[in-house]
Amino acid sequence: MRIKNIKVSGFKSFCHPVNLQFKQHGITIVVGPNGCGKSNVVDAIRWVLGEQRVKHLRGGSMEDVIFAGSSYHKPSGMAEVSLTFSNPKGDTLHQYADYTEIAVTRRLYRSGESVYMINKTPVRLKDVRELFMDTGVGGTGYSIIEQGRVGEIVSSKPLERRTLIDDAAGIVKFRFKRETAEKRLEETTQNLFRVTDVLGALSEQEDGRS
């Protein structure tokens, strides 16, 4: 999977819709003077992939990602970012493997309402994270390395490094499936206990009538 383009509207300094195209071969470099919004492009990518930690978006609250207005432009009512990936080899979950392109969209309104979409279909944040599981692309993945990140990894705790290594090794998906299965098993066990209690109560009532 490779990033094909990113569409940004009302996000941070992007008051007007902007569509950035990325080369499918080689390296794309975003250049410009200080304060022109280069870091906001990276923030937009991280945000649309499900980043929930405001400090990693360089803001005080999540609403800070919505364009706040300027001397010449009114504040935006929402922020929207859409990130399109080329998927020629079907390197995704089976339900999206047949798509040659996958577009992930995130919207945030000033009311606090948040919307996620995959190929224009509303989904949950969980679905977005599962889509990129084991690819390193997610908001907390190893594909986005900002200033100071290498130092953080070197000085991080063993458990934190283990999480990063597991992601790179491609075993996060299997751990997630195991945890999901264990949770369902626990729920099924609890339901079975409740059914057993109900059957026991009914049996006692039946014996009382006899």
Task: State each model region's role.
Residues 2-210:
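Gly/Lys-enriched N-terminal cap/neck module of very large, oligomeric protein machines
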